[in-house]
Each structure stands twice: as C-alpha cells, then as structure tokens.
C-alpha cells in the first residue's frame, strides 16, 4: 500500500511533477467494484498498441488524449498487443519491460484503470480461440493483398511468417471478442478494420447473427497528426528517431532534438506562406505553447523579423514543460510493479469476462455445445 502512495497523479496533467499522490485506496475500490462488467448501455470501444518501443508525442495527441476523453463516455477496452509484436520482434527478452513501460505511459498520460479496461493481449486466451475460428473465414488471397503485409514483406524479407499474413485476422479477433462498436484507427489500419467487418459478416451469414460490424471512431477535427522534426511526414517509432519526441525523453534530449529541427533561411516577403518545415514547427508549438506565444511568433514571421533560434528555444522549453510531468509519472508507475500487477489483474478479469461471454456464444452458434 505504501508503494502505491509513491506513484504520482495518473490522470490529467500538472506541471508540478511532485503533485500530491491520489487516493489509490479509492482507485482500487472502484476497480474492485467494476470487476463485473457493467450493463451500462454505453457503446464499447476497443483499441490496442504494440509494445515495440516508447510512446511518442504522436501517440499522445493522435490517440491517448482522445482515449482519456473516451473513457468518460464509453466502455473502453485498451489492450497492450504483445502477441502482435511477435510478428516483427520475435525476441521476447525485453518484452516484459516493454509491456510494463507501455502500461505505465498509458496510465501516466491519463488512462484511468478504474474507468477503462487496461489489459494485456496474451492474458486473454479466448482471443486465440476466436482467432482460430476467424482464420477459417479468411482467405489467403485477400490477406496477401493487404498493404501492410506487402510493406512488411518488403522491409523484412527474411522473416515473412504466417503471423504477418494473418495479422488482420488477429486484429479482428481482438475487436470482435468484445463485440466492440467503435475502433479508433488511423488511415493505415482502415483496411484491417474493413476486413474485421468482412469476417463478422461471414460468421453471421454462416452460423447466425452474433457480431455487429465495428466502425471507425470518428474523431472529427480532434484527430491530430503530429509532424516529425525533420519535416518528413509524421512522428513515428520506425522513422528518424532523432526527429521523434518520446514521452520518455529527458529534458536535455528534448532540447537537443528541437534545436536540430529543420528550418529554412527565413522569410523575405511579408505575410508569405510558411514552407512545410516551418509550418511543422508552428503546428508543434500549437500543441504545447500558449496561444499568445504562437501569435507572437506568427506575427514575427509575417513581418520577416522572426529568429528561428528563438522560435526553437521557446518550443523546446514548452515541450519540456509538457513532457517532463508525464515522463516522471511514468517512471514512478513503471517501477511500482505491485501497482502494475494489480492493474493488469483487474483489467484481465474484466476483459476475460467479456471474452468468455463472446466465446460461449460463438460455440453455441457453431454447434460446439455437443452435450
């Protein structure tokens, strides 16, 4: 119990990383009460993240920030997809640390385990059973045509395993095991969601109605794409690591990365359009800086008096103020293995109750209830 009191604030953000610890007794009391899946009438949302690296600013603004809001309005199932990681990272030596790190960073970013079901994929064996069933409804030709499979074959020709080919089938099992209504996905995963809809349709047609067809969660204008610091696309784990700001980066590394952000020689015509690399910096600033700060530098750019060194210094300090509280909270949570074990235990209990109910219905529809 004492170790729980050392963990910092798990939801919301405060620039005071030494903020008073929350009442973890109350948190776990709420978690205990919600072990039974509530019949709330709320729509179910399911999403997962692979434990293949630290979370970055793009993960936060592109997903986590919205997840924090969603947990107040939906029954949310947020999964650490450790089985999925094996398709590209078969060495499991660091898997435990990676899973714990992702859990800690999710909680530090605001996911409340007393409100959302936070669990690990491999702790829910019913997913594997549904995966097997759905594989009988998937076809080699359609799986080989998926853009992500073709891209992985190009990137890792020495390891084209069956897990890569059937990756969309496992994703479908992740979603359908909870009979989720909404799935927050990026454009790169839209094809996989459509396949999940197809598998649901095929099951319903062959064995009887069971699954609703999952839909992409529409964030509308709230969906944010965070640009990389080198001006080449969005922040990503797989691209230029020095152009990506991680939630685990220390203050000096944040400053170093931001100061190396790509710029041009500066504007020479008043009120000219910003080139992409400069627009990227302003977009990043709009995420973490005050409105007054953004307006000040925007005006400087418009009248050709902007100094990029000052712009990047300001952005660096604002990034430090934003990231450092999350990093410090995540570090404390990560090292409190007792707390994380309790979170996973509670999340697994909720997720398994939902999964078992679905699998029982699957077996009934398919006629596996022989006696």
Give the ranges of each region predicted by the language model:
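N-terminal Rossmann-like or analogous alpha/beta NTP/dinucleotide-binding catalytic cores
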Residues: 32-173, 327, 331
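Short helix-capping/linker segments at secondary-structure and domain boundaries
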Residues: 140-144, 177-184, 289-297, 327
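Internal, conserved structured core segments that host functional sites
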Residues: 154-203, 207, 227
């Amino acid at each position: 119990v004492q170790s729980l009191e050392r963990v910092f604030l798990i939801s919301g953000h405060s620039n005071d990383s030494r903020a008073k610890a929350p009442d973890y007794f109350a948190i776990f009391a709420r978690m205990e009460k919600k072990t039974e899946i509530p019949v709330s009438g709320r729509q179910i949302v399911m999403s997962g993240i692979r434990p293949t690296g630290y979370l970055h600013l793009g993960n936060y603004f592109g997903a986590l920030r919205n997840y924090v809001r969603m947990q107040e309005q939906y029954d949310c199932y947020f999964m650490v997809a450790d089985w999925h990681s094996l398709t590209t990272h078969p060495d499991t030596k660091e898997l435990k640390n990676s899973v714990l790190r992702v859990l800690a960073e999710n909680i530090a970013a605001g996911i409340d385990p007393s409100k959302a079901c936070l669990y690990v994929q491999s702790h829910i064996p019913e997913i594997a059973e549904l995966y097997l069933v759905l594989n009988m409804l998937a076809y080699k030709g359609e799986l080989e045509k998926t853009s992500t499979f073709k891209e992985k074959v190009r990137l890792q020709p020495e390891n084209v395993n069956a897990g890569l080919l059937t990756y969309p089938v496992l994703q479908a099992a992740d979603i359908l095991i909870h009979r989720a209504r909404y799935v927050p996905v990026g454009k790169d995963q839209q094809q996989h969601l459509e396949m999940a809809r197809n598998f649901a349709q095929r099951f319903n047609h062959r064995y009887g109605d069971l699954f609703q067809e999952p839909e992409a969660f529409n964030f509308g204008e709230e969906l944010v794409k965070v640009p990389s610091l080198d001006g080449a696309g969005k922040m990503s784990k797989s691209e230029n690591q020095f152009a990506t700001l991680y939630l685990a980066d220390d203050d000096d590394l944040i400053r170093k990365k931001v100061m190396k952000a790509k710029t041009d020689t500066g504007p020479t015509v008043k009120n000219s359009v910003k080139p992409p690399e400069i627009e990227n910096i302003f977009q990043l600033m709009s995420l973490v800086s005050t409105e007054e700060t953004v307006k000040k530098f925007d005006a400087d750019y418009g009248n050709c008096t902007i100094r990029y060194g000052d712009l990047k210094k300001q952005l660096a300090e604002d990034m430090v103020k934003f990231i450092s509280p999350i990093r410090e909270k995540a570090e404390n949570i990560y090292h409190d293995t007792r707390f994380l074990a309790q979170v996973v235990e509670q999340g697994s209990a909720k997720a398994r109750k939902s999964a078992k109910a679905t699998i029982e219905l699957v077996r009934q529809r398919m006629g596996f209830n022989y006696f």
